[in-house]
Amino acid sequence: MHSPIPELPRFERRLTGPRAAPSSPVSTNGSPLNNLVRSRLSDGALNFTGGRIATPLPQPSLKTPESPLSKRNPTIKQNRVRFDLPDDELSRSNVSSPEKTLLTSASTSTFDSLKKELLPELPSLAYSDDDEFPSSPEELNSHVNYPDVRNVYDCHTGLQPLVDHDCIEDRQKTFASKQLPTLPLQKSSKLSNRRPALHSFHSAPANSLYPLPTPTSQLPSNLSSNNLFQSDSLKPSMVSSHTSTKPVLYRGNSEKSCHSCGGSLRAGRIISASGKKLHPQCFKCDTCSQNLEHVGFYYREGKFYCHLDYHEQFSPRCKHCKTPIEDQAVHINNDWFHENHHFCAGCSEVFNVNIPCIYRDDLYWCQTCYDNKYAVKCKKCRKPILGISVKGSDGEYHSQCWTCGACNALLGDEGYFMIENTPICRPCKAISVKFNLD
């Protein structure tokens, strides 16, 4: 029988630990009397192994670090004692039970066996310090060990994963120029219990390019739409660089190019005029380079003009004032007039629809002015003869002006006599002869 360890007060248990040896009462100043504890430890009377007295162990080192003051009594300084166990005791305390060790070893072996069956070793590169780094893809493939894909099982279904051998072989042939490591696969005829094959463009390498769908109507004559996509072929077709050419911008050729300079219209403001699109700075007169953004303009033969330059170059000119006609015009005998400049050269009366005009000597005349200027004048009244005239020996007369100089009778067709440049009828001539009136 071992003598029980006397129960310590709560205050002393806190000082020395739950399994510490009984100590002497605390002094009045708050520090424990450690001499008794040190003497017992030196004699080997106490050993702490689960609260029982055992064979003496090597003397532990006693450390009494200073602790802060207690919150209950700040004046009393509390010290805690910590015992450092030797290394052999620590090793003995960590030894587990035989049952636990046996269970651990059994579970470890089971996990290792399942790991080897379910997760085969991945291909790895093993080089020593003396080996040299492979300089070619063929030398690299000689150092790589790849597992057989048929030995890998699906952990969820217990079935082997499906591998499309035809697809992989075609892909290897296509990218043979890249010298990629290939998998040593073999064709298998037992596919009854496997999943159906899914042909998808996503199974191809990420750097492969496939042609975009092309409508049948746009295909060349030597190609057909059936040759574009095949469900059992995943061979990528690389787009050649010479197929896409940069478009050449001509002046006014494209809606996205400026009509004047041919530059791009993708950014900034765009002006649309007469079905043409231009930069704001390019929308100017072709003659004087005036900006036409906020003024009137004219479009002719692919060029833009301001108001003045267009009329100066293309509008007809008035025959009277020699200036371009901008508004309504009068066109007669290949001549152009302003509406108010077509008037009589004699009286300046403007011609209209009701007033006829007569053209002579490169001028336009009204009837009155024309008669006054160009008509034959009567020898007697000096007025123009517009109708029937009588032609005398000294000139033409109106029919009513053709009379006898003595009696003013109409001469008619009876004949006459000229006396002193005056026509005299027959009766008047007879009287003059009778009475010697000469």
UniProtKB/Swiss-Prot annotation:
GO cellular component: cell division site; medial cortex; mitotic actomyosin contractile ring; mitotic actomyosin contractile ring, intermediate layer; nucleus
Name of the protein described by the UniProt record: LIM domain-containing protein C4F6.12
Matches recorded under InterPro entries: Znf_LIM (IPR001781)
GO molecular function, one term: metal ion binding
Cross-referenced CDD domains: LIM (cd08368)
Pfam families in the record: LIM
In-chain residues carrying the UniProt-annotated modification Phosphoserine: 67, 96
Biased composition (Polar residues): 24-37
KW Metal-binding (keyword) present: yes
Domain LIM zinc-binding: 256-316, 318-375, 376-435
Keyword line: LIM domain, Metal-binding, Phosphoprotein, Repeat, Zinc
GO biological process, one term: protein localization to mitotic actomyosin contractile ring
Stretches the record annotates as Disordered: 1-37, 49-78
